[in-house]
Structures are given as structure tokens and as C-alpha cells.
Amino acid sequence: DLRVTRPGFLEGIKHLKEKEGTKDYNPNTMASRQEMRTFVCAQCHVEYYCGPKAVLFYPWHNGLKVEEIEKYYDSYKFKDGHRFFDFKHKITGAEVIKAQHPEFELYSQGVHAKSGVACADCHMPYVREGATKVTDHYIRSPLLNVNRACLQCHHFTESEMLDRVSIIQDRNFKLQNSAESAVVDLINKIAKAKELGASEEQLVDVFEFQRKSQWRADFINAENSMGFHAPQEAARILAESID
């Protein structure tokens, strides 16, 4: 049987399910096998805090969307009473959030998750070994195994499936570059303002813009699917970053 054991995940999913209306959620006794085929991956392929200021935690108390995670971080206080931040930006001094690798969070907003497709369905598709059907433990990108990872559900040619993915990822890459350029432009303008004598107090609101914009751009950059796990959600997040 599949089991999840990581304390951070068990606490995180408990908070998430409580927000959704289910108290004392235990995935090992309450999740379906199909859900567990994602949860075993979500023990690590997620956003989390792991540093010297607090015990490792997953920020899912308000939900899995980028702004819901941000809301929790903004409300979180370290033991010294200071609000959450991963580091102070060297050039501007803004207190920013560093995304880890939020694959589970972005995937949860996509069509595959909504359709009940688990991580293992694509990254560990079933294979036959004699008369037995087992998951392929050669874990890799579905693009390296399109026939078994994709074509069991999508009845198109392998080349067409690869083209579809390429279009999605190319569009995301361009939008991601635009978002990151916008963040860099903002950082340079803050640096110029400080050079001209702007005080920390005068730049408080601008620091918040950097925190929000950089968090969103980094969320998609760090997520590792180049937007594929949830293309529309990735585009929304990057558009907010640019804005």
C-alpha cells in the first residue's frame, strides 16, 4: 500500500483539508489510492519553508494558489515577531519570498488534476511485466515516453502531442521572460531611487510591489513544468507579476 510519512506534508495537507471543510484529515486512512498516487510525490515536489527561523512547514493554510500561499506568508510571524521572508534583496533591501519547486500546487490548478489524473499516471505510467500491470519506476518526463504516458488518454499522434506541449511551453517561456524582465526593471528603478536619496519609508509600498512581483515570477520559474501543469494559471500568475 502507498503511504505518506513526511511530517511537513501531513501537517500541510491537514490544514488544507480543514480549510476545505474536512477536520483531522489523515491521507493514509482517508485518501483514495488515486489521490495517494499524487500525495506520495507532493511530500517533496511542493512549496515549503525550511530554514533556521522555524520548523519546516508547508504554507497551505489558505489554499494552494499563489496568492493564497502569499497571504499565509504575509500573516506568518517568526519567533522574533518579524513577518515571513526568505531573504532581503541585496540591491533593494526588500523582504522577498523565494519559491522552492511548487509542482503540486500548480498541477492542482490544471486540467489534469481536475480530471483526476495523478502524478504517477504521466510520470510513472503502467507497464506490463508478464501478466502483471505495474507502474514504471523509471521516473522521468512524459515527453520521453509519450506513447504510454500520453496516448493512453489522448488519441493523437506522438508528434502532435509533442507539438502541443512545445507550443504551451514556448508561450509560457516568453511570458516568463517578460515577467522576469519587469522584475529586473523594477529592481533597477528602486536602486536608482535609493541612489537619488529615497528613504526606506518612502519605498515601503514599492518594496511590496517587488515582493509580490518577484514571488509570482519565481513561482513559475521554479515550478519545473514550464507552465504545462496548468497553462492558464501560469499565464495568470505571470501576467500579475508583470502588472
Could you say what each language-model-derived stretch is?
Residues 1-121, 125-243:
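Primarily the internal scaffold of c-type cytochrome electron-transfer domains
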